[in-house]
């Protein structure tokens, strides 16, 4: 609901910079179900690198954890900003913004996709912009789901431990795959 309130629609970009927390999934699944591209930014990047990613990706909305307030204060990119889990000067409160919104799904749900960035070992971080799913159904299968169920025998009873930062491709994609199958994900901070 928040994404639509800010005019974000199919193929628009939202960016997150968060520590590992269950809210990470609330935001990524919300973006995924809204047909958005969601950029998960490393909390280890400099303000210059983060600004570059926000500008390069075309992010229209940025959500940062209040625990990263030091990094948040140094950003210069002009984008609508929210902080999660506490006050950050210059950022709206995500919790306050969500409170009046309906808890029901949006009417125009469709599948979105992550847009992750490399660590920039040969220069600036590079965004990997994969095509949005052709089938807009939010419950469609994908190659990771088929691999997880076929090779690794994941089921709705599976419990998956993810010890790595969720801004990395493998932890994010595998844990969301477990969710898609109906399993449980345990994340480490």
List where the protein language model places each region.
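Conserved AMP-binding/adenylate-forming
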Residues: 2-48
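Conserved S/T- and glycine-rich ATP-binding loop of Class I adenylate-forming
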Residues: 14, 31, 62, 118-121, ...
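Short beta-strand elements of ligand-binding domains
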Residues: 18, 41-42, 65, 79-88
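Short hydrophobic alpha-helices that are characteristic scaffold elements of the AMP-binding
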Residues: 28-34, 56, 168, 176-180
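Conserved G/P- and acidic residue-centered "switch" motifs that form tight phosphate/ATP-binding loops
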Residues: 35, 121, 182
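Conserved ATP-dependent adenylate/AMP-binding module captured primarily in the ANL superfamily
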Residues: 45-74, 95-96, 100-101, 138-161
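ANL superfamily adenylate-forming
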Residues: 70-116, 124, 130-145
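Conserved AMP-binding/adenylation subdomain of ANL enzymes
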Residues: 136-159, 163, 167-189
């Amino acid at each position: 609901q928040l994404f639509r309130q800010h005019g974000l629609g199919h193929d628009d970009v939202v960016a997150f910079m968060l520590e590992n927390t269950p809210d990470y999934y609330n935001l990524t699944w919300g973006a995924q179900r809204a047909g958005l591209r969601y950029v998960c930014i490393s909390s280890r990047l400099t303000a210059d690198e983060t600004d570059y990613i926000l500008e390069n990706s075309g992010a229209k909305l940025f959500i940062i954890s209040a625990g990263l307030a030091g990094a948040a204060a140094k950003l210069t990119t002009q984008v609508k900003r929210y902080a999660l889990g506490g006050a950050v000067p210059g950022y709206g409160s995500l919790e306050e913004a969500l409170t009046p919104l309906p808890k029901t799904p949006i009417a125009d749900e469709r599948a979105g996709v992550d847009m992750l960035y490399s660590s920039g070992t040969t220069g600036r971080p590079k965004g990997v912009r994969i095509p949005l799913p052709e089938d807009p159904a939010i419950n469609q299968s994908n190659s990771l789901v088929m691999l997880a169920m076929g090779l690794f025998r994941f089921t709705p009873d599976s419990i998956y431990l993810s010890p790595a930062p969720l801004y990395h491709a493998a932890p994010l994609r595998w844990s969301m795959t477990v969710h898609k199958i109906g399993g449980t994900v345990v994340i480490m901070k």
